Swiss-Prot record:
GO terms for cellular component: plasma membrane. Glycans are attached at residues 18, 22. Its main location: membrane. PANTHER family: DNAJ HEAT SHOCK N-TERMINAL DOMAIN-CONTAINING PROTEIN, DNAJ HEAT SHOCK N-TERMINAL DOMAIN-CONTAINING PROTEIN-RELATED. Residues 160-298 have a biased composition (Acidic residues). It comes from Plasmodium falciparum (isolate Palo Alto / Uganda). This is Ring-infected erythrocyte surface antigen. Transmembrane segments: none annotated. It is found in: Cell membrane. It holds the Pfam family DnaJ-X. Residues 142-159 have a biased composition (Basic and acidic residues). It is a peripheral membrane protein. The keyword Repeat applies.
Amino acid sequence: NSITYNFENINSNVDNGNQSKNISDLSYTDQKEILEKIVSYIVDISLYDIENTALNAAEQLLSDNSVDEKTLKKRAQSLKKLSSIMERYAGGKRNDKKAKKYDTQDVVGYIMHGISTINKEMKNQNENVPEHVQHNAEANVEHDAEENVEHDAEENVEHDAEENAEENVEENVEEVEENVEENVEENVEENVEENVEENVEENVEEVEENVEENVEENVEENVEENVEENVEENVEENVEENVEENVEEYDEENVEEVEENVEENVEENVEENVEENVEENVEENVEENVEEYDEENVEEHNGI
């Protein structure tokens, strides 16, 4: 299938009375003879070249984005079969003319079947062409007729519109001139009255807005000035009052602290004096008692 796909699109230069023809235009016998020669040349090349030829053909044929997956699978199967046949020719059966002949005939048979199938499809397409041509011609006639009708209708409408427009313009110009004069007089009077009323209203609104703005500005300025004056006065008064209060509080606190300190000092001095007096008295009494005791003992001893 892969090979027939290529034969459909390739022109083969065949020496037939010095004329170049497409292989698909030849008779069945001529096609078979040419293909047998081609396959015979293929099976005589080396195994390395066969592998590269099959690989390159597979890459080109299987990378065609215009076919579906089913067609690609069929191509792959055909390439696989052709590759296996080529490998046998390159192996031990290279000189086996009988096997070569039968294998060549098998390959050519597959190719010829594909070509005949393509020819049938092309014949069917050619037979269906007149029907399509007639159908397309009728469709085009209807389409062109509709377009021409629409086009003529548009042109007629535009032409009539232009003529009517010119007539209407002349009539309208006269009416417009008359209406303009009347409207000018009426509009002058109305505009004068309206402008007077509008100007009065606008002036009143502007005066009211200016009054409000001035009142707000004056209020803000007065508030700021009063606040500053009141702050200064309050600061001075508060400072004086706080100084006097702090002085009085400080004097009272100091007097209380002095009294407390005096009481504490008196108590401490009394305790210290008592302790000192006790110690002194004890020492003096001890000394006196010792002296008295010694004198008494001396007297008793002498009396004995």
